[in-house]
Swiss-Prot record:
Its EC number is 4.4.1.21. Homodimer. One of its GO terms (molecular function) is iron ion binding. Involved in the synthesis of autoinducer 2 (AI-2) which is secreted by bacteria and is used to communicate both the cell density and the metabolic potential of the environment. The regulation of gene expression in response to changes in cell density is called quorum sensing. Catalyzes the transformation of S-ribosylhomocysteine (RHC) to homocysteine (HC) and 4,5-dihydroxy-2,3-pentadione (DPD). GO terms for biological process: quorum sensing. It comes from Clostridium perfringens (strain ATCC 13124 / DSM 756 / JCM 1290 / NCIMB 6125 / NCTC 8237 / Type A). This is S-ribosylhomocysteine lyase. The gene is luxS. Its cofactor is Fe cation. Keywords: Autoinducer synthesis, Iron, Lyase, Metal-binding, Quorum sensing.
Length: 151
């Protein structure tokens, strides 16, 4: 199997929450695409709830784009410990952290979930505003770092 960047990360030595630049790709026409690991909870110790994570995905899709112009996608990690963000350009981790703090703060102010209906969402019943707010609050209280390895 081809080496996968995320499998090369020593998950026993990271300290969540953090933002990590997971890689940069340069396309055949010179386009730069950056990938970020937005880790909310500690790998192999905690999980984001299915409903809370799905709801956060909906919120982050909008709020992160309010601060970052070149977002391609924000996707939940299969391990349920955070999200991947892909973006055009070589963006600084500090800018991602600032946008994420803004976005999670905005989640705490919300009273309804965007696009949580069968027309716009493939799993419209798999949402919880309460759990999304709880996850957002926990990440903000713990503080988001750009230092991801435990020393």
């Amino acid at each position: 199997m081809v080496k996968v960047e995320s499998f090369e990360l020593d998950h026993t030595k990271v300290k969540a929450p953090y933002v990590r630049k997971a890689g940069i790709k340069i396309g055949p026409k010179g386009d730069i695409v950056s990938k970020f690991d937005l880790r909310f909870v500690q790998p192999n110790k905690e999980l984001l709830s299915d409903k809370g994570m799905h709801t956060l995905e909906h919120f982050l899709a909008g709020f992160m784009r309010e601060k970052l112009d070149d977002v391609i996608d924000i996707s939940p990690m299969g391990c349920k410990t955070g999200f991947y963000l892909t973006s055009f350009g070589d963006i600084n981790v500090k800018d991602i952290i600032e946008a994420l703090e803004y976005s999670l703060s905005k989640v705490l102010e919300q009273e309804e979930i965007p696009a949580a209906n069968e027309l716009q969402c493939g799993s419209a019943k798999l949402h919880s505003l309460e759990l999304a707010k709880s996850h957002a609050k926990q990440v903000l209280e713990n503080g988001i770092s750009d230092k991801f390895y435990v020393e």
